[in-house]
Swiss-Prot record:
Active-site annotation: 64
Function: Catalyzes the interconversion of 2-phosphoglycerate and 3-phosphoglycerate.
Database matches in Pfam families: iPGM_N (PF06415), Metalloenzyme (PF01676)
Involved pathway(s): Carbohydrate degradation; glycolysis; pyruvate from D-glyceraldehyde 3-phosphate: step 3/5
Binding site for substrate: 125, 155-156, 187, 193, 263-266, 337
Top-level taxon in the UniProt lineage: Bacteria
CDD domains membership: iPGM
The name this protein goes by in its record: 2,3-bisphosphoglycerate-independent phosphoglycerate mutase
EC number: 5.4.2.12
Single GO molecular function: phosphoglycerate mutase activity
């Protein structure tokens, strides 16, 4: 069959960074005969996946959203974090028309301003500096009831690191003489993205009704009580913060609610719980008719509320360019990273392009992935191998979540198991690509599993790293690797391997030169 396509496959091993030291390195210490041989024998290079190279502030660790946007765009895409930092530094944030109107509306009607978000310096889903700027904006414009609902991190930050953030905000409210921290809860509940509505319900009830399993006089006391119960930041149970004599901070009709997370994937569920009239994830005991609900950035095109910083659109991303040249493509991953190989890889476009198929494999329903480090990789690999051999696709883009999702648990032995599982999967993918006479690129979006303990604190290292990631070529062309690349060079590399023109919007450079 002359129409059988020889696919170019991009396999993204999420959280699979490159680090030379063996100590606490789940990737180097795992038994990975397949990846070892590929690294020794195939054209390969290391590429940058963090900081300025991906449009983040200098030194900022990479993350999956940012990684996939850069992978698909073929140019450095300045991230919301960098954009917001700049807005605050230059003062434009404080005159943002959407934010100022929402605060002014609450002031005029004598209603409360509620600010919620991940109170963290992690910079992945939010940044506490942005939340601080929002508190200052509200106070400057005359809001008298400012309530901060703090989601705690411990995933993109050390597992027990929230105290300094809570102290910082407590001091700020004392200085303003107005406002307070009204609730604390771990992101495990407030920021679920896998339709575990029982978790989200606990967060929703805490926020709307000031109803939680625990109560404390102040946020630090609430946190310390959670630690005493054995809960790390990420898992802090819903805690109402209310000293004797303080008004309760339940959300009421006409109040303003501003959600300060800038990353979409873990902000969508709880936002829909607040704003969707037809919401059916659970029975909401209280539905609040807000004066204003503001999302900091656009969490999804179908969430119809005001947005302070709408997305800047990207043209001629890799997926769009393939469509314009009548190429077929497949995107495939598990639930945990499905949005990354579709929405984020397509530059924030939700709808598939013409000629783009998608396969979603359900991630296992376990509390944390150290309990099942292989996740759904067997089914994912089976579907991927079948697609490679189908002759249907010019390009296949796949993400294996294991290195990242298991790396986030901080469980070293589980991370080793995850990496060994991936090696077995890669063996099958390589064989399928060779059988189809195709080409394969293996890379990662950022590091994680190569650093499982924080040498400074001795705590488990659950966050991403700023280390480079591998890029390996397997295929039917003789190629030479170029040094000094970054994630945004991958799309131009793929087009060049397919002997296609590279659009002028893509400023990245090919990293494998055909000899």
């Amino acid at each position: 069959m002359s129409s059988t396509k020889k696919p170019l496959v991009l396999t993204i091993l999420d959280g699979y960074g490159h680090r030379e030291e063996q100590q606490d390195n789940a990737i180097l210490n795992a038994k990975t005969p397949v990846m070892d041989v590929l690294w020794q024998q195939q054209p390969h290079t290391l590429i940058a996946a963090s900081g300025l190279d991906v449009g983040l502030p200098d030194g900022q660790m990479g993350n999956s959203e940012v990684g996939h946007v850069n992978l698909g765009a073929g140019r450095i895409v300045y991230q919301d974090l960098t954009r917001l930092d700049k807005e605050i530094k230059e003062g434009d944030f404080f005159t943002n028309p959407t934010l100022t109107a929402a605060v002014d509306n609450a002031v005029k009607t004598g209603k409360a301003v509620h600010i919620m978000g991940l109170l963290s310096a992690g910079g992945v889903h939010s940044h506490e500096d942005h939340i601080m700027a929002m508190v200052e904006l509200a106070a400057k414009r005359g809001a008298t009831a400012i309530y901060l609902h703090a989601f705690l991190d411990g995933r993109d930050t050390p597992p027990r690191s929230a105290e300094s953030s809570l102290k910082r905000f407590t001091a700020k409210f004392a200085e303003l003489g107005n406002g307070r921290i009204a609730s604390i809860i771990g992101r495990y509940y407030a920021m679920d993205r896998d339709n575990r509505w029982d978790r989200v319900q606990l967060a929703y009830d805490l926020l709307t009704q000031a109803k939680g399993e625990f109560t404390a006089d102040n946020a630090v006391a609430g946190l310390q009580a959670a630690y005493a119960r054995g809960e790390n930041d990420e898992f802090v149970k819903p805690t109402v913060i209310q000293a004797t004599g303080e008004a309760d901070a339940a959300m009421n009709e006409g109040d303003t609610l501003i959600f300060m997370n800038f990353r979409a994937d873990r902000a969508r569920q709880i936002t829909r719980t607040f704003v969707n009239a037809d919401f059916d994830g659970f029975k909401r005991d209280k539905v609040v008719n807000f004066g204003d609900f503001i999302m900091l950035t656009e969490y999804a095109a179908d969430i119809k509320v005001a947005c302070a910083y709408p997305p800047a659109s990207l043209t001629n991303t890799f997926g769009e360019w393939l469509m314009k040249h009548d190429k077929t493509q497949l995107r495939i991953s598990e639930t945990e990273k499905y949005a990354h190989v579709t929405f984020f890889y397509n530059g924030g476009v939700e709808e598939p392009f013409k000629g783009e198929d998608r396969i979603l494999i359900n991630s296992p329903k376990v509390a944390t992935y150290d309990l099942q480090p292989e996740m759904s990789s067997a089914e994912l690999t089976e579907k991927l191998v079948s697609a490679i051999g189908s002759g249907k696709y010019d390009v296949i883009i796949c993400n294996y979540p294991n290195g990242d999702m298991v790396g986030h648990t901080g469980d070293y032995d589980a991370a080793v198991k995850a990496v060994e599982t991936l090696d077995n999967c890669i063996e099958q993918v390589v064989a399928a690509v060779k059988a189809a006479d195709g080409q394969l690129l293996i890379t990662a979006d950022h590091g994680n599993a190569e650093q499982m303990r924080d040498p400074a604190t001795g705590q488990a290292h659950t966050a991403h790293t700023s280390l480079p990631v591998p890029l390996i070529y397997v295929g039917n062309k003789a190629v030479k690797a170029v040094e000094g690349g970054k994630l945004s060079d991958i799309a131009p590399t793929m087009l060049s391997l397919m002997e296609m023109e590279i659009p002028q919007e893509m400023t990245g450079k090919p990293l494998f030169i055909v000899e």
